């Protein structure tokens, strides 16, 4: 099944121009993460962040997130780029930000992390699976524990929570409303109107 991408027509004094909706949003410094986070999606988000940084490093970027999560190493590539560039990044949860999506939501510029009123946010520990020889499984287990430690440290920094609380709360799926996520420190405000 192919996905439908809407197009918008923009009229100017020089004529009409057709844009796919994502390109039009990018003109307004808006990036949309919708769906599962994988290497392909992460590469697209990273490219958009780098493009907007090159356009104007002083202007904010609005990063809208509606994601069930995904591959943590893919999310780390987005996270590292968010911190690498100079532009402030407003993160806005629309719908849900779960797992790696919640991690990215919390990683926006402090004071500029938002949720819509009926959004759902969920944090948990990284998921993984391994097969093969016992040694291969042991290597993968050590790596997932290393990633869990890094993720918990970043989440503690982002939220202001103690590392022990993050570790305990992410032991299983931990769901929050927008308001609960605000109290937890994942977001700073609940939005009811556009950021304009």
UniProtKB/Swiss-Prot annotation:
<dbReference type="GO" id="GO:0004252">
    <property type="term" value="F:serine-type endopeptidase activity"/>
</dbReference>
<dbReference type="GO" id="GO:0009368">
    <property type="term" value="C:endopeptidase Clp complex"/>
</dbReference>
<keyword id="KW-0720">Serine protease</keyword>
<keyword id="KW-0645">Protease</keyword>
<comment type="subunit">
    <text>Fourteen ClpP subunits assemble into 2 heptameric rings which stack back to back to give a disk-like structure with a central cavity, resembling the structure of eukaryotic proteasomes.</text>
</comment>
<dbReference type="GO" id="GO:0004176">
    <property type="term" value="F:ATP-dependent peptidase activity"/>
</dbReference>
<dbReference type="InterPro" id="IPR033135">
    <property type="entry name" value="ClpP_His_AS"/>
</dbReference>
<dbReference type="InterPro" id="IPR023562">
    <property type="entry name" value="ClpP/TepA"/>
</dbReference>
<protein>
    <recommendedName>
        <fullName>ATP-dependent Clp protease proteolytic subunit</fullName>
        <ecNumber>3.4.21.92</ecNumber>
    </recommendedName>
</protein>
<dbReference type="GO" id="GO:0005737">
    <property type="term" value="C:cytoplasm"/>
</dbReference>
<dbReference type="InterPro" id="IPR029045">
    <property type="entry name" value="ClpP/crotonase-like_dom_sf"/>
</dbReference>
<keyword id="KW-0378">Hydrolase</keyword>
<dbReference type="GO" id="GO:0051117">
    <property type="term" value="F:ATPase binding"/>
</dbReference>
<keyword id="KW-0963">Cytoplasm</keyword>
<dbReference type="GO" id="GO:0006515">
    <property type="term" value="P:protein quality control for misfolded or incompletely synthesized proteins"/>
</dbReference>
<dbReference type="InterPro" id="IPR001907">
    <property type="entry name" value="ClpP"/>
</dbReference>
<comment type="similarity">
    <text>Belongs to the peptidase S14 family.</text>
</comment>
<comment type="function">
    <text>Cleaves peptides in various proteins in a process that requires ATP hydrolysis. Has a chymotrypsin-like activity. Plays a major role in the degradation of misfolded proteins.</text>
</comment>
<dbReference type="InterPro" id="IPR018215">
    <property type="entry name" value="ClpP_Ser_AS"/>
</dbReference>
<feature type="active site" description="Nucleophile">
    <location>
        <position position="99"/>
    </location>
</feature>
<dbReference type="Pfam" id="PF00574">
    <property type="entry name" value="CLP_protease"/>
</dbReference>
<feature type="active site">
    <location>
        <position position="124"/>
    </location>
</feature>
């Amino acid at each position: 099944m192919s996905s439908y991408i809407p197009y918008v027509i923009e009229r100017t004094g020089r004529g009409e121009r057709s844009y796919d909706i994502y390109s039009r949003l990018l003109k307004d410094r808006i990036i949309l993460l919708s769906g599962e986070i994988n290497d392909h999606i992460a590469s697209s988000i990273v490219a958009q962040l780098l493009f907007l940084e090159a356009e104007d490093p002083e202007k904010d970027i609005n990063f809208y997130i509606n994601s069930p999560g995904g591959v943590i190493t893919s999310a780390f590539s987005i996270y590292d780029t968010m911190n690498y560039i100079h532009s402030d990044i407003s993160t806005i949860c629309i719908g849900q930000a779960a797992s790696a999506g919640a991690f990215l939501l919390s990683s926006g510029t402090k004071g500029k992390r938002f949720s819509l009123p009926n959004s759902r946010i969920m944090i948990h520990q990284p998921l993984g699976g391994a097969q093969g020889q016992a040694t291969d499984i042991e290597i993968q287990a050590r790596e997932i524990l290393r990633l869990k430690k890094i993720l918990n440290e970043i989440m503690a920094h982002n939220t202001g929570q103690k590392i022990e609380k993050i570790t305990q709360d992410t032991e299983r799926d931990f769901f929050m409303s927008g308001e609960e996520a605000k109290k937890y420190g994942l977001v700073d405000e609940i939005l009811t109107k556009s950021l304009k």
